[in-house]
Amino acid sequence: MMIKQAELKRLERRVDYTFSDFSLLQQALTHRSALGNHNERLEFLGDSILSYAISTDLYARFPKVDEGDLSRMRATLVCGKMLAEIGREFQLGDCLILGPGELKSGGFRRDSIIADGVEAIIGAAFLDSDIDTVKKLILKWFDSRLNTIEPGISQKDPKTRLQEHLQSRKQPLPIYEVLEIKGEAHNQRFTMSCSIDGLKSVQGQGTSRRKAEQIAANKMLDSLSGAK
């Protein structure tokens, strides 16, 4: 299968990076099941660069946190599930180049293939630019997650922690609502509310609905901590 150039240009806008060497992006999207130059070497490179970018940011962000907590936070941020979430925010599955068998079995929806594609794009962007540029790009992708992760606690995302907190107290689950969507389709900003019975609702903003919900959930967790 081939991906139209117009779709790849839209993907560039979603990932917020424009390739000088367009063939690197095409290779990053090519699974080994497809004919041609596949993405496994780029994935290998991207995995190391991702670990470097997240490690250095966590090291600077948490100067008093020990190696164990830093490692746990990094593992949470760079795990396959998290990378697949980011890939879905980019609608990466629609752009993957798969062989007929993988395509038929729904490989474009598989977490592992999407996560590998994200790492391959990181590797491709590094070869296309430099380490500082690609580090800034990675930190932009992970911004809301880096802003909500904390040491010394279960490394679950804020929505999950909020849900488990309420369920443990047999309270109704939170309600999330879209308050506003601004911007063009490729550059939208969402404002979401999070409401719980008996507490003032809070708002979160982000470049995707999920990011805005996570930020709102984190604010609600802070409100619940203050209410204790």
From Swiss-Prot:
Residues 8-130 form the RNase III domain. Its cofactor is Mg(2+). GO terms for biological process: mRNA processing; regulation of gene expression; rRNA processing; tRNA processing. GO terms for molecular function: double-stranded RNA binding; metal ion binding; ribonuclease III activity; rRNA binding. Mg(2+) binds at E43, D116, E119. HAMAP family: RNase_III (MF_00104). Digests double-stranded RNA. Involved in the processing of primary rRNA transcript to yield the immediate precursors to the large and small rRNAs (23S and 16S). Processes some mRNAs, and tRNAs when they are encoded in the rRNA operon. Processes pre-crRNA and tracrRNA of type II CRISPR loci if present in the organism. Homodimer. This is Ribonuclease 3. It comes from Psychromonas ingrahamii (strain DSM 17664 / CCUG 51855 / 37).
